Amino acid sequence: VSGTLYGLGVGPGDPELLTLKAVRILRTVPVIAYPAPLEGDGLARRIVAAHLPGGQTEIVLRMAFDPTQPPPEAAYDRGAAEIAAQLDDGRDVAVLCEGDPLFFGSFAYVLERLAGRYPVRVVPGIASPMACAAALARPLSARDERLVIVPATRCEDDLAATLAQCEAAVVMKLGRHLAKVRRVLERLDLAAGAQIVAWASHAEQKIMTLDEAERDGVPYFSLVVTRRTSR
């Protein structure tokens, strides 16, 4: 009998934002797997460190993180093969994923390689837009407002066309795309209420206006939250 593949959402960064179910699985599963840079621990591993019992087998998917490039297929191929070997031996494997596993999550790349071959259980996690709304203490949307969540990596015209159809928006993966996103928000009358959250729920969390972000710069893990109207 093969093991079960778990996609484990570990939340946006604060270790106390893991679900009870995620913590239970972390403490009982014999194998964990997670993406990490070429050197050092990955973010997901750091988030769960305090909850790990020790003695588990750890599969590290080493890869160069470059948001301008496609996902590193070879790294995911190797990682999926290592995970499959553990599952074939009857050992459950929990793949750690920042935020929610199926919302812009790295677990999706493992899942597409192993789905259909093993039992799969996905444990949802708190995604970054929800953590940003909590940090700002403001609703993402209300009543019948249309909410759009879109990555800043889209081209400017596509962003404008998408955001023109909504009353509330979250723009993710901001980083070097700040100037482009600001132009679009100003064109669509969405800039006035915009706030930026970097590293939501982390110790280094920072909340900024567009002007402050343009002056100081923003990391890749930054989001813009805005609404056209308030109610």
Protein language model features and the residues they cover:
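Short gly/pro/ser/thr-enriched loop/turn and capping motifs at secondary-structure boundaries
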Residues: 39-41, 66, 127-131, 178-179, ...
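A generic local secondary-structure boundary/capping motif
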Residues: 21-23, 84, 137, 158-161, ...
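General beta-strand structural signal in soluble alpha/beta enzymes
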Residues: 34-35, 60, 95-97, 122-125, ...
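A contiguous loop/helix-start segment that scaffolds small-molecule binding in enzyme catalytic cores
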Residues: 5, 88, 163-231
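Class I S-adenosyl-L-methionine
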Residues: 1-15, 20-118, 207-208, 214, ...
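Structural motif corresponding to alpha-helix initiation and N-cap regions
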Residues: 41, 77-80, 153-157, 178
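Class I SAM-dependent methyltransferase SAM-binding "motif I" and its flanking Rossmann-like core
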Residues: 89, 99-165, 215, 229
